[in-house]
């Protein structure tokens, strides 16, 4: 599973990539975000064009740039990101195919274009979106929860939503984010990692929880340890994988799949 670190710190970013992360994300998305996420406690970055240039100079890892949702500014943002060395553009808050097609035209093959599925409209159109020549698709749980007016962040991982999107995606697929296996809240990172493995997730993000949990730790030790933990989950026995899925669902919903299965088995035919 590829790990992409959100950062504009050249020393930190290059150390994490040298330790085994696949690359860096520089985050330009801010238009309408403060209003959309008001009171949600989410992270809103203030990364700049110069930050992208600095991160390009700092690492040979894959460099992704999340721009703003599609609008009159998109062509200029794409041109600037390409000029500064972005390997891929990430287009957030997608709702339909028209904006994706316009962005693909504007990219014009100069770099990859990935999209973030983080609205119910995009979930409903996942098959059509996945038919486009995209470099990757990521399901963003924070904005999806807000768009759905839901309360539980990880609900789409247990109600079939992410499974349904995953089934449509043939290019690299990502969802959620990880931190060190023994950390993570409100769901332990080890259980979340197991569910990402269950889904066949190709990549995920390392964000503020990872950076906070890494304080005083050596990336050269901790990043390989995280990757090794994911590799071990991939080779787990089916019984162990089923048990972890039950633990994950219980952590998200408070309801045990094992108890549900037992209750169903007890019902007379």
Residue ranges and their predicted role:
Residues 50-60, 113-123, 164-170, 201-206, ...:
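Short, basic, helix/turn surface patches
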Residues 32-55, 71-76, 92-111, 121-127, ...:
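Active-site-adjacent beta->alpha loops and helix N-cap segments on the catalytic face
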Residues 10-19, 72-84, 99, 120-133, ...:
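Catalytic cores of alpha/beta
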Residues 24-29, 92, 135-143, 206:
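Non-cysteine beta-strand/loop elements that form the S-adenosyl-L-methionine
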């Amino acid at each position: 599973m590829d790990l992409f670190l959100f950062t504009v710190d050249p020393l930190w970013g290059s150390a994490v990539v040298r330790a085994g992360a696949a690359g860096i994300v520089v985050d330009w998305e801010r238009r309408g975000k403060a209003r959309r996420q008001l009171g949600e406690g989410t992270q809103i970055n203030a990364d700049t064009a110069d930050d992208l240039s600095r991160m390009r100079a700092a690492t040979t890892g894959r460099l992704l740039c999340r721009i703003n949702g599609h609008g009159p500014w998109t062509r200029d943002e794409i041109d600037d990101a390409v000029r500064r060395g972005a390997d891929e553009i990430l287009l957030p808050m997608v709702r339909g195919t028209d904006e994706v097609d316009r962005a693909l035209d504007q990219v014009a093959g100069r770099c990859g274009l990935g999209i973030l599925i983080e609205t119910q409209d995009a979930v409903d159109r996942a098959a059509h979106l996945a038919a486009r020549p995209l470099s990757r698709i990521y399901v963003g749980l924070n904005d999806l929860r807000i768009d759905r007016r839901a309360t539980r962040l990880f609900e789409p991982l247990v109600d079939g939503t992410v499974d349904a999107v995953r089934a449509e995606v043939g290019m690299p697929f990502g969802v959620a984010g990880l931190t060190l296996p023994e950390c993570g809240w409100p769901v332990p990172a080890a259980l979340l990692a197991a569910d990402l493995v269950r889904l066949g997730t190709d990549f995920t993000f390392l964000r503020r929880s990872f950076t906070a949990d890494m304080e005083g730790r050596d990336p050269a030790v901790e990043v390989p340890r995280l990757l090794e933990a994911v590799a071990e989950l991939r080779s787990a026995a089916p019984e162990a994988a089923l048990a972890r899925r039950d633990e994950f669902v219980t952590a998200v919903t408070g309801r045990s799949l094992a108890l549900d299965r037992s209750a169903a088995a007890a019902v007379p035919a």
